[in-house]
């Protein structure tokens, strides 16, 4: 569970194994989709694995512009692409782990995030709940990232045939 110190569950928190996981990226069998709908990015935060293809599409009847701003030192390359109504989805992937802000240069209120990780991860639902699946037994550091509150970490042990648990409380600003 991820919540604020006011007791509210936090949506759009990305949780991932930042230490202890040495396996491969856990590429999903479904392609993550970042949609431009009602002049908002949906989901607001899109988590994915390093090297995983994802699609950017538009459901709006207006032209949008998708402009991720990765740190060039990571090896991820910024891009800036217009997407008119009815355009085919744009397929992309990222080379390195990073939290990447996304903006629309046409509609300045539109912003979102790509969170690129290696290994098992989860994003909280609207109540702050999450489950990280496919975690082998071992000792890990779980990192929770939220766009306003930043990062927190916790040590977690997953026993053979068992599950680990980590609850995060972020101090409201």
Where are these regions (language model features)?
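A short, solvent-exposed beta-strand micro-motif common in secreted/extracellular proteins
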Residues: 13-17, 54-58, 106, 138-147
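Short, small-residue-biased leader/transition segments that mark boundaries at the very start
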Residues: 1-3
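Extracellular beta-sheet/turn segments enriched in Thr/Pro/Gly and aliphatic residues
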Residues: 19-49, 53-57, 88-92, 158-173
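A short, solvent-exposed loop/turn motif at the edges and junctions
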Residues: 20-22, 29-30, 40-43, 61-80, ...
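Structured interaction patches on ligand/partner-binding surfaces of diverse proteins
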Residues: 83, 116-124, 149-166, 173
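A structural signal for beta-strand and strand-to-loop patches characteristic of beta-rich domains
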Residues: 99-101, 108-123
């Amino acid at each position: 569970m991820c919540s604020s110190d006011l007791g509210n569950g936090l949506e759009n928190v990305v949780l991932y194994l930042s230490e202890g996981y040495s396996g491969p990226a856990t590429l999903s069998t479904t392609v993550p989709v970042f949609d431009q709908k009602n002049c908002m990015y949906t989901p607001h935060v899109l988590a994915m694995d390093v090297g995983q293809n994802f699609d950017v599409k538009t459901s709006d009847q207006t032209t949008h512009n998708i402009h991720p701003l990765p740190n060039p030192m990571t090896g991820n390359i910024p891009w800036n692409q217009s997407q008119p109504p009815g355009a085919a989805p744009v397929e992309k992937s990222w080379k390195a782990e990073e939290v990447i802000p996304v903006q629309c240069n046409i509609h300045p209120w539109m912003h979102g995030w790509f969170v690129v990780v290696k290994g098992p991860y989860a994003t909280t639902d609207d109540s702050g709940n999450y489950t990280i699946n496919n975690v082998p037994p071992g000792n890990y550091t779980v990192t929770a990232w939220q766009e306003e509150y930043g990062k927190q970490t916790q040590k977690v042990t997953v026993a053979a045939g068992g599950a680990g648990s980590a609850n995060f409380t972020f101090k409201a600003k």
